[in-house]
Amino acid sequence: MPATQSPLPSLAATLGATHKDLSTARLYEEAIRRGEAVIAADGPLVVRTGKHTGRSPSDKFLVDEQGSHDDVWWGGFNRPISEQRYERLRARMVAHMAERDVFVQDCFVGAHLDYRRSVRAFTETAWASIFCQNLFRRPKAAERATFSPDFTILDAPSFRAEPERDGTASSTVILVHLSRQEILIGGTEYAGEMKKGAFGIMNFRLPDEGVLPMHASVNIGRDGGVAIFFGLSGTGKTTL
């Protein structure tokens, strides 16, 4: 199924105060100045993510649209939302962000040059932009000159969905449009939703290229043997 480029990258042109690809040091200063974070011993930033200290799977929906409908295993985890509701929510979320400072970060998801994808993240907070720098891979200077995002993330934690109007489970909402390769996040400050959304699109796309995505870590023994460790988050894969 071919993907269509998200129209969200042009959002930056419509916003008044847009901070594009700031350095970590500048973002650090902005996070402190704006009261988003405090400095802990030895200098790391500490933030509070409110009521959401982890992902909120019950608030996540995939857009049920023609381009991806037959390729999704619909059910309890992959829950559908109509394209009409998505468009209405998207318009309100974009309008919400247009009234705020927005931090824009261009990154790559994946290390392999043949399989990585480019992502542009629009975040409401400076610290979330640092999160993107740390979690994803930053382009080199030469790559920035020709950077074009394959998919887009819009992270608006202060946005609130209206369940009766929007068909959501709560005021928190995470929407993924697989054909447009857009991820919209509202009502949660937990930055891991950006990671999971990006990985979800990669997991959807890469099998068509003959690549098996795995939630795993790999270790190589002295004799060159390879061991793959599978497990849920926090089960010690990286430690092993």
List the model feature ranges, each with a label:
Residues I220-L240:
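Glycine-rich phosphate-binding P-loop
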Residues M1-V226:
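A noncatalytic interaction/capping subdomain that flanks phosphate/NTP-handling catalytic cores
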